[in-house]
């Protein structure tokens, strides 16, 4: 539903930020990493967003960097890891250290984070190692099929928007598609993204 919020930063703390967008104030839960990168209150800010919906509860999560949002979504895909724990993990360590721990098979790094036990740490590594590797291989500046992931992503976004999907829903579907498509081209990403949209 929401891709990002751009507006005046009204206030922030270690776990949330309030952004005024056109006279409407939005409260987004954030990690320590995002908090440390926020500007001063009164300045303009852009926060990438994820709307988490569960039963009758809707909560917005905000991220300064796309890499952090992608890792948040990956963590949510793991059974037993909800948004609260995913945000705690992102607050416990920088994104790079979390990825390194997963790639190097070091669960002890993760279960040092509050709320992460040995079983959860092992599950995170087991389920995310290959997906993190694929994500790193398809970052901007590296080739993925016929072009960089940034170019592929934008082309796929435009294709989905032409089909009538909002940019926000298309963005989330494309992000998931990039993580699961093998040697993705634009057609592969669009096909996978459409499947993701139908399943959500």
From Swiss-Prot:
Its main location: cytoplasm. CDD domains: UBA_RuvA_C. Disulfide bonds: none annotated. Residues 154-200 are annotated as: Domain III. It comes from the Bacteria. GO terms for molecular function: ATP binding; four-way junction DNA binding; four-way junction helicase activity. Residues 1-64 are annotated as: Domain I. Residues 65-143 are annotated as: Domain II. It is found in: Cytoplasm. The RuvA-RuvB-RuvC complex processes Holliday junction (HJ) DNA during genetic recombination and DNA repair, while the RuvA-RuvB complex plays an important role in the rescue of blocked DNA replication forks via replication fork reversal (RFR). RuvA specifically binds to HJ cruciform DNA, conferring on it an open structure. The RuvB hexamer acts as an ATP-dependent pump, pulling dsDNA into and through the RuvAB complex. HJ branch migration allows RuvC to scan DNA until it finds its consensus sequence, where it cleaves and resolves the cruciform DNA. Has three domains with a flexible linker between the domains II and III and assumes an 'L' shape. Domain III is highly mobile and contacts RuvB. This is Holliday junction branch migration complex subunit RuvA. The gene is ruvA.
């Amino acid at each position: 539903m929401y891709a990002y919020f751009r507006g005046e930063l009204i206030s922030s703390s270690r776990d949330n930020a309030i952004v005024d967008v056109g006279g409407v104030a939005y409260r987004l839960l954030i990690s320590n990493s995002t908090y440390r990168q926020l500007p001063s209150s009164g300045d303009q800010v852009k926060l990438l967003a994820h709307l988490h919906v569960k039963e009758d509860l809707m909560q917005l999560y905000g991220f300064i960097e796309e890499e952090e949002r992608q890792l948040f979504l990956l963590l949510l895909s793991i059974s037993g890891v909800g948004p609260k724990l995913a945000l705690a993990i992102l607050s416990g360590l920088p994104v790079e250290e979390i990825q390194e721990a997963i790639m190097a098979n070091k669960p002890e790094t993760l279960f040092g984070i509050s709320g992460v036990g040995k079983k959860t740490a092992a599950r995170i590594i087991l389920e995310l190692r290959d997906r993190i590797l694929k994500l790193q291989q398809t970052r901007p500046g590296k080739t993925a099929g016929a072009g960089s992931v940034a170019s592929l992503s934008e082309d796929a976004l435009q294709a989905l928007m032409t089909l009538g999907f909002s940019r926000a829903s298309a963005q989330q579907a494309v992000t998931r598609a990039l993580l699961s498509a093998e040697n993705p081209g634009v057609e592969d990403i669009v096909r996978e993204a459409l499947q993701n949209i139908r399943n959500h």
